[in-house]
Amino acid sequence: CTRGCRFCAVGTVRTPPELDPEEPKELADAIKRMGLSYAVITVVNRDDLYDGGASHYKDCIQRVSETNPGVGLELLCSDLDGNLDSLEMLLEGLPLKVFAHNVECVPRLDSVVRDPRASFEQSLKILRYAKEIRPDIMTKTSLMVGLGETDEEISEAMEMVREAGVDMITLGQYLQPSIRHLPIDRFPEPESFADWDGTARELGFRAVA
């Protein structure tokens, strides 16, 4: 990954290796060997590439679908550096059930939690446009808690996400990958998660976890 978000255990590389032309085939073959009925394809940020990696991601998913025609596919995508042209190229004709991109944290904590090149608003832009150009695909995002946010900010963030047309949301407890990462601010009680679940369903999310 070319970014250095302060919550994430994935390593940061300033000069990543070249794309592997064999990756689409290897990915498709791995999914076939595992006998999966549903697969989530997760990617890293590749700000070094002109399209943020979109064309390679598309090649991977198309190969997976061709090799495994009965497998449901979900893409957990980067923000493609906010490049809507890359997003449109990626999603055109792509055999996806779910397009996911994570807002990660409430807007106030962007500068603390995420790489400077990422933001809540940019993530919303990606999610909103994905729904506009492919209304047949379910959109999904995730929000971490335990980073210093308030309960009110979580509710406000969910409202903004829903207004962007996002269909599904997950809320999860942040866990510190190492002492070099952000410390945990709190562990909300299960009752808090139940309250957020209710709020999300009232807002109209089709699935909440």
Named regions from a protein language model:
Residues 1-23:
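Canonical Radical SAM [4Fe-4S] cluster-binding loop centered on the CxxxCxxC motif
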Residues 3, 31-40:
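Short, flexible active-site-proximal loops enriched in glycine and acidic residues
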Residues 11, 44-46, 76-81, 104-106, ...:
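Active-site beta-loop-alpha junctions enriched in small/polar residues
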Residues 25-35, 59-71, 85, 89-95, ...:
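Auxiliary Fe-S-binding modules of radical SAM enzymes
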Residues 39-59, 148-153:
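Conserved glycine-rich "GG(E/T)P / GGGxP" loop and the immediately following alpha-helix
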Residues 45-50, 107-113, 177-183:
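A short acidic, helix-capping loop that chelates divalent metal ions and anchors anionic groups
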Residues 48-59, 83, 109, 116-124:
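Active-site-adjacent beta->alpha loops and helix N-cap segments on the catalytic face
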Residues 101:
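Small/polar (Gly/Ser/Thr/Ala-rich) solvent-exposed segments
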